[in-house]
């Protein structure tokens, strides 16, 4: 049976994260059966409520443990049960404006003027994330910290990701 299934709570606007995502269940039954045929699969949520079999694809869900029961219909005493953990991983907590973005005005008509841009990570240590900075959509080489000093006009953006590659 499959290990824990992780999915990032990656709403277009991170302010809309709600802990519910669409899990791809298209390969669940093939993975569970591992080539066996003629078996019956039953699914139960954390409260023991029977779920549809096969599971809907996608399965829209919050983090939960789904119990899977595989049974031989010819010999009902021959069965196996496993727990399939579904985990929704929140995105990094970044301070954003009401439009779901972070913006800062940089005046570049002053020679030698620079400004420090901050990735806006809040709620956790900035060192627990990885950063990729971009200027006009092109990755800036070797800029991997939570702040960047800039003096060139353009649109700066940053991808902030956690250890699960959610960004």
Where are these regions (language model features)?
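Proline- and Ser/Thr-rich low-complexity, intrinsically disordered segments
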Residues: 1-167
């Amino acid at each position: 049976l499959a290990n824990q299934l992780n999915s990032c709570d990656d709403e277009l606007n991170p302010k809309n994260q709600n802990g519910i995502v669409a899990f791809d269940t298209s390969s669940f039954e093939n993975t569970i059966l591992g080539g066996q045929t003629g078996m019956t699969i039953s699914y139960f949520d954390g409260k023991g409520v029977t779920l549809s079999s096969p599971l809907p694809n996608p399965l829209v869900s919050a983090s939960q443990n789904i119990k899977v029961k595989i049974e031989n219909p010819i010999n009902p005493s021959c069965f196996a049960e496993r727990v399939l953990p579904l985990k929704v991983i929140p995105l990094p907590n970044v301070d954003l404006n009401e439009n779901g973005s972070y913006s800062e005005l940089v005046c570049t008509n002053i020679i030698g003027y620079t400004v420090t841009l901050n990735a806006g990570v809040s709620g956790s240590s900035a060192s627990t994330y990885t950063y990729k900075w971009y200027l006009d959509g092109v990755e800036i080489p070797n800029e991997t910290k939570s702040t960047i000093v800039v003096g060139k006009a353009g649109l700066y953006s940053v991808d902030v990701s956690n250890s699960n590659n959610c960004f």
